Amino acid sequence: MKKLSPSLKIYILLVLVLALSNAFQAYFQVYQSFMPPAELPAPPLVLALANAGIAIFLYGGLGYIGLKLSGRLGFAAIWESDVTNRQRFVVPALIGAICGVFLIISDLIFSPFNSIGRFVHPLFPSSILASVSAGIGEEIIFRLFFIPFWVWLISIILRGRRQNQVFWIISKISALAFALGHLPSLMILYGFKSVGDISPVLIIEIILLNGIISMLAAYYMRKFGFLAAAGIHFWTDIVWHVIWGIAQVIL
């Protein structure tokens, strides 16, 4: 039997952490701390198992495909031997913290004009689990799977030419998809009936803030591996959702 690589072992661990985090949030309904109350479609245990299954099979499966394709494209592996722990953990944490501060400042600037005021955040400590799930799950879908898949597919069509340009184009599309992917939850949270009800200023804010984080995550994933991308996202959310969320409650 072929021995699992360190990168694959870490990936499996990340998927299991995602599954546990999602299951815990579903079982204890932590999202109701900041979302409008709604009747559960199934018992909490069923929801927890369903969320864990989605994380393992859907997220895990798509991420595994992306993991294999990223290796073919020359992206850094999750546990690339040439990547230092400083590049893999420390620098992404610092970048994430800076991005979190940037989101806070932007929130204060945009809030008088975006029609909803300041963004609401999950209550502590559920905000930590939300940060874990976003840092792993959203990065698996929008970075680890989306970018390598489309770069690989287009590279076949172009026979390997202009791969760097293709990477940046796909990264921008991924960033836009990631930003717009927040609109459905935003509509539920603030009671918008359609996308047309959302203020253009708010849409610009969402695209700008999420887009910057997405582009940084894409670059660091290719250069230093998936852990770097997940780290940027996770530490951004820790500052933005956890620390700023607590500060807003206190202040």
Across the structure, where does each feature detected by a protein language model lie?
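Alpha-helical transmembrane segments of multi-pass membrane proteins
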Residues: 14-34, 63, 67, 103-109
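Juxtamembrane helix-loop-helix connectors linking adjacent transmembrane helices
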Residues: 38-39, 45-46, 70-137, 151-161
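Alpha-helical transmembrane segments
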Residues: 8-22, 92-99, 171-177
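Alpha-helical transmembrane segments of polytopic membrane proteins
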Residues: 46-59, 202-207
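Membrane-water interface of transmembrane alpha-helices
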Residues: 61-73, 146-149
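Membrane-interfacial helical/loop segments at transmembrane boundaries in membrane proteins
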Residues: 31-41, 114-121, 192-205, 251
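Alpha-helical transmembrane segments and their helix-start/interface "positive-inside/aromatic belt" motifs
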Residues: 1-15, 48-52, 83-94, 227-232
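Transmembrane helix-loop-helix hairpins at the membrane interface
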Residues: 125-251
